[in-house]
């Protein structure tokens, strides 16, 4: 099985048994600089899909809103304090390991310098992105 087949991520063509899996809610931060570039980070070693590029963020904890989870995750992962988020879109993605709802939020304003607290790399990008591989569902 090729890497692309393994990482097929299309909720419109779900895998066998996908309907029985619970949906994992994930807050996703699309950090955008004034010049229009957006931030992608690489998944660190030890995590599923290590080395793949994605927007920063993470799973919602019980009782958290998308915004609360995003604020927490960006402190944990990047060491920044978000000033405000703007809910953007939702996307249901059928990964081999989980059925995931990505809750995208645009972030235009934050305090602090980026610190890669989980050993990940980062890159400011424009479309088409230059980093690879990119996790399906990201861009």
What label would you give each PLM region?
Residues 77-84:
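Short secondary-structure junctions
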Residues 3-15, 86-88:
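Short Pro/Gly-enriched beta-strand edge/turn motifs at strand-loop
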Residues 24, 33, 81, 89-114, ...:
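Active-site-adjacent beta-strand/loop module that shapes the phosphate/pyrophosphate-binding cleft
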Residues 28, 51-54, 121:
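Residue-level recognition of specific faces of alpha-helices
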Residues 37-76:
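Conserved Nudix-box catalytic region and its N-terminal flanking loop in Nudix hydrolases
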């Amino acid at each position: 099985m090729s890497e692309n087949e393994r990482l097929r991520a299309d909720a419109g063509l779900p895998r066998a048994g996908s309907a029985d899996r619970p949906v994992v809610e994930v807050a996703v931060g699309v950090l955008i600089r004034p010049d229009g570039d957006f931030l992608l980070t690489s998944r660190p070693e030890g995590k599923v899909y290590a080395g793949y590029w994605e927007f920063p963020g993470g799973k919602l904890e019980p009782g958290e809103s998308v915004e609360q989870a995003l604020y927490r995750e960006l402190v944990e992962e990047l060491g920044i304090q978000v000033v405000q988020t703007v809910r953007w879109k939702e996307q249901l993605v059928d990964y081999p390991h989980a059925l995931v709802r990505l809750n995208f939020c645009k972030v235009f304003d934050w305090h602090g310098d980026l610190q890669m607290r989980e050993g990940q790399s980062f890159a400011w990008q424009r479309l088409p992105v230059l980093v690879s591989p990119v996790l399906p569902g990201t861009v």
